[in-house]
Regions:
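Structured catalytic-domain cores with a bias toward divalent-metal coordination
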Residues: 1-201
Length: 201
C-alpha cells in the first residue's frame, strides 16, 4: 500500500503524463492510515484498536482524524489499499498442505444495498473491470477478495463487503465510487517486494 502510493506520487510529480493528470483531477493520499501498527507490523493501532473495524464505532483517535479529513475532502472516488495473506488456513484445512492464492491483487466492492445501485455498478463494473484489464496487460493476476470458511468439509467463499465497518461500504455510503483493494503481502516479508509494489501502482 504505502510503497504503491509513493510510486504514484513520484509518477504524478515527475512525469509529463502525471503532470497533465494533475491538471484534471485533485487527489488526497494517506500512504499509511495506521502508522503505529505499520511500524510494529501488527494489525491494531497504538491505542489497541483495529482501525479496519472502527468505521462505525469511531473509538480510535486516528479513526476520528481520518473521518474528519474524509468528510472535508468529500471525494467522488475512494480507494483503500490493504495486504492479504496468500496462505489461507482454510485451504490447509481442506488439503492438508499450505496452498497460496494465485492472485496478485484482489478487489472487494461493497454489496451494501443502501449504496445507490449506480454507484455499486460503477465500483464493481467499470472501475474494477478496467483495473483488472490493466493488471492483466501488465502481467499481473487479479480476482475478487473473499472471506473463506470451511463447513462440512467444503470451502465457502463470501464476497462483497456489506458491513458499514468496512471502508469500502462506509465510503460507498457517502456516495463515493469505492473499492477496497488487497495486495498479496502478509507473511511474505521482502519476497517479490517489487512486484507487489508495482502491481499496486
Amino acid at each position: 500500500g504505502p510503497e504503491a502510493a509513493c510510486m504514484l506520487v513520484d509518477y504524478l510529480l515527475n512525469t509529463p503524463e502525471g503532470t497533465e493528470l494533475l491538471k484534471k483531477v485533485s487527489l488526497a493520499l494517506v500512504p499509511v492510515a495506521n502508522t503505529d501498527g505499520y511500524a510494529m507490523q501488527i494489525r491494531k493501532s497504538g491505542s489497541g484498536y483495529d482501525l479496519n473495524r472502527d468505521q462505525s464505532k469511531l473509538t480510535d483517535p486516528v479513526t476520528l482524524l481520518l473521518k474528519k479529513a474524509y468528510k472535508e475532502w468529500n471525494p467522488e472516488i475512494a480507494l483503500d489499499i490493504h495486504e492479504f495473506n496468500p496462505f489461507r488456513k482454510e485451504f490447509e484445512l481442506l488439503r492438508g498442505t499450505k496452498t497460496a492464492t494465485a492472485a496478485d491483487v484482489l478487489f472487494l466492492p461493497s454489496g451494501h444495498l443502501n449504496i445507490p445501485a449506480g454507484i455499486r455498478t460503477l465500483s464493481n463494473g467499470l472501475f474494477r473491470e478496467e483495473a483488472e484489464k490493466t493488471l492483466e496487460a501488465n502481467g499481473y493476476h487479479s480476482g475478487f477478495y473473499f472471506t473463506p470458511s470451511v463447513r462440512n468439509d467444503s470451502l465457502y467463499a463470501m464476497k462483497d463487503a456489506k458491513s458499514p465497518q468496512s471502508s469500502s461500504t462506509f465510503q460507498g455510503l457517502t456516495n463515493a465510487v469505492s473499492l477496497f483493494i488487497e495486495i498479496r503481502g502478509i507473511g511474505l516479508g521482502r519476497a517479490c517486494f517489487a512486484r507487489r509494489a508495482e502491481c499496486g501502482f
